[in-house]
């Protein structure tokens, strides 16, 4: 029985090491690159003394951020993602709430850490992702891991003014991904188009099945969601066939006549949520891509 989400990555590395796992317009990481960088980060965090504690990941949305998440898990810790799109006060409250001693940053965020008042150890991704991995250390950490260990804490929007952390743990994530994948029919040929920020739990629908099946996830630029035609062209350019989006993003495409200009050529699986899908817009989607399945 699988007890650790890292098994998804390790099993896939054995099968398709050089296949693209995560990509955006600027960079891409293969499964072996995700594995190697994550293990290096895990080794560095362990050397720094991190274990069974939160590690904040303060990076822009990119493939390397996802590798950092799994580096934190390799260290036996749990990741807490924050993003420069968040209001500064929100990030400060998250840091106060977690009382984290470690933070991973990249070039885009390094000059913004001081403003958050973080007083712990800040590690640059560019350096710790190149640390020589120590398999002996990582094996020892794994031997002490349990399926009830936390792997992330993601914070809600904070309707009361104070963000609240939601904990994900190995067993819960594994059970969810196994069930979701069975229903939606993911496989090695799945190409996801990610919409949501990496600090929201909605991105789990793409990140973990990608590792499980050796699929591919494209991180779609936020700017695309302002221009429906450009968005559909992005889907076509990268042969994206599966999306798990909020209804408002789907409506933005259908309601503005986008299908008169361009239609999604490869989409066959569309999972939607967050609100009711208006019948008129839903029918437009169904008529445009009649062979697609909607969930």
Residue ranges and their predicted role:
Residues 59-63, 77-93, 107-109, 215-238, ...:
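ATP-dependent adenylate-forming carboxylate-activation enzymes
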Residues 1-172, 184-185, 214:
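Carrier-protein-dependent adenylate-forming modules in NRPS/ANL systems
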Residues 212-215, 240-244, 254-295:
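Gly/Ser/Thr-rich phosphate-binding loop
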């Amino acid at each position: 029985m699988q007890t650790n989400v890292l098994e998804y990555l390790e099993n896939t590395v054995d099968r398709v090491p050089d296949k693209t796992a995560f990509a955006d317009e600027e960079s891409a990481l293969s499964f072996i690159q995700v594995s190697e960088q994550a293990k290096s980060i895990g080794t560095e965090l362990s050397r720094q003394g991190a274990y069974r504690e939160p590690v904040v990941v303060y990076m822009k949305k990119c493939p390397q951020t996802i590798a950092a998440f799994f580096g934190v898990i390799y260290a036996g810790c749990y990741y807490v993602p924050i993003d420069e799109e968040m209001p500064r006060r929100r990030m400060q409250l998250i840091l106060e709430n977690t009382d984290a001693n470690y933070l991973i940053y990249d070039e885009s965020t390094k000059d913004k850490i001081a403003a958050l008042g973080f007083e712990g150890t800040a590690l640059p991704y560019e350096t710790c992702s190149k640390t020589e991995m120590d398999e002996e250390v990582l094996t020892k950490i794994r031997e002490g891991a349990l399926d009830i260990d936390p792997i992330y804490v993601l914070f809600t929007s904070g309707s009361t003014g104070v963000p609240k952390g939601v904990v994900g743990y190995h067993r819960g994530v594994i059970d969810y991904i196994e069930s979701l994948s069975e229903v939606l029919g993911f496989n090695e040929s799945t190409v996801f188009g990610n919409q949501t920020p990496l600090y929201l739990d909605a991105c789990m629908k793409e990140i973990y099945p990608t590792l499980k099946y050796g699929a591919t996830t494209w991180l779609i630029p936020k700017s695309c969601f302002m221009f429906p035609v450009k968005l559909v062209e992005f889907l076509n350019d990268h042969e994206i066939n599966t999306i798990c989006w909020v209804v408002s993003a789907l409506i933005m495409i259908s309601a503005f006549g986008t299908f008169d200009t361009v239609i999604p050529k490869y989409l066959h699986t569309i999972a939607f949520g967050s609100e009711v899908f208006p019948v008129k817009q839903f029918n437009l989607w169904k008529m445009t891509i009649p062979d697609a399945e909607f969930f």
